[in-house]
């Protein structure tokens, strides 16, 4: 059977969404929204969307046949059957108001993802950190095993050149978003929880117990014959395990993990470890990603694959050949500067735990390099809520260039901006950070800061990623152009 025939067979098994033909995405340039839109385009739906700025996601969707408008306007939704929105979109958005007036159904991103998953074998990956990498690793293992899954990932899977793809099998592998509790819409066959920390607490009324209970509810969306794959190394996950009334498979470095990593070592970008599973021979593996946190992500993929009886050879090959994900400890190259060669790495992590894991991976893989971090805080509320944690973790680098907060649409909060954070780090006494008032000014500072052999790490979830790529394309020539607008 050809791939086209297999896809046709799959389509015949999955009911279409009744009369829905034309689907419009408000904020289509986001990775999650754009990924779902790409799958729907390839399923044959007429997809349109809008965002405040053009980016790689909108460009790709245009090439696939989606109709993209830059800017939000009521006329964009005049001829559509349903409007899909993310929580980043203000309810006063003109397209939302127009859809309400026209009585067009408005659904959240996770509701549309749930529809895609409804008639498939869903694998949903949740957790405060590591979702994108874990989802990418699972998709890669399943692809290596010939399972040809559909996947929707929150970052660019480098080997596929996209963050979403429509496969020909019954499998759908996707990130599950806890930031707005919308992951409760999903009803997968397998759920993964990587870890649980206090983040997006405005969604949960500042109540950490409510957040933990919501993760338990997410796992209880599994059928009674489904499988919950959880990281036993995480203290909060371990705490809620007695409340989970589903089959559990645990993973981690802990001795009581069902899927356990042993003999960990790291050299440069690669990690080596042995995985021990109940009833199976030990497996020696090479992971083409740095850091113990990524070994945990790989263990989740191994646990899911083992439960689905995927051959160890596919696991082994997928991990050693893994090409990474965009903006997840992404090596952008080595560049000559007047003072010597500098290595440039870009990372999306924007929570203190994520930043700490990135620093640890950099220290382990390149212990002789001076670590220079250009960090852009993301959201005033996160900076306020985790302020002391940020002060502590950012003090661990050798040189810190601290940009102002990327607001992501939030109003400024006094005492939770880049200048305040810079002062607090300086008062701690471990290093003297340099405040960068505008991303454009970073290039002006770098020549005086960088030394031969440095590892320059650009870190954060805002437009610092665009700046990092601009530095790479100019070989750290520091000819910085205008950065993209903050996307909706």
UniProtKB/Swiss-Prot annotation:
EC number per UniProt: 6.3.2.8
Signal sequence interval, chain numbering: none
Name under which the protein is recorded: UDP-N-acetylmuramate--L-alanine ligase
Protein's organism: Shewanella baltica (strain OS155 / ATCC BAA-1091)
Entry's family note: Belongs to the MurCDEF family.
Positions in coiled-coil regions: none
Enzyme superclass (EC): ligase
BP terms from Gene Ontology: cell division; cell wall organization; peptidoglycan biosynthetic process; regulation of cell shape
Highest taxon in the source lineage: Bacteria
Protein's job: Cell wall formation.
Keyword Amino-acid biosynthesis appears in the UniProt entry: no
SUPFAM superfamilies per UniProt: MurCD N-terminal domain (SSF51984), MurD-like peptide ligases, catalytic domain (SSF53623), MurD-like peptide ligases, peptide-binding domain (SSF53244)
Catalytic reaction(s) noted: UDP-N-acetyl-alpha-D-muramate + L-alanine + ATP = UDP-N-acetyl-alpha-D-muramoyl-L-alanine + ADP + phosphate + H(+)
Compartments where located: Cytoplasm
UniProt binding sites for ATP: 127-133
GO cellular component, one term: cytoplasm
A molecular function GO annotation: UDP-N-acetylmuramate-L-alanine ligase activity
Pathway per the UniProt entry: Cell wall biogenesis; peptidoglycan biosynthesis
InterPro entries hit by this protein: Mur-like_cat_sf, Mur_ligase_C, Mur_ligase_C_dom_sf, Mur_ligase_cen, Mur_ligase_N, MurCDEF_pg_biosynth, UDP-N-AcMur_Ala_ligase_MurC
Main location (coarse class): cytoplasm
Keyword line: ATP-binding, Cell cycle, Cell division, Cell shape, Cell wall biogenesis/degradation, Cytoplasm, Ligase, Nucleotide-binding, Peptidoglycan synthesis
Disulphide bridges, residue numbers: none
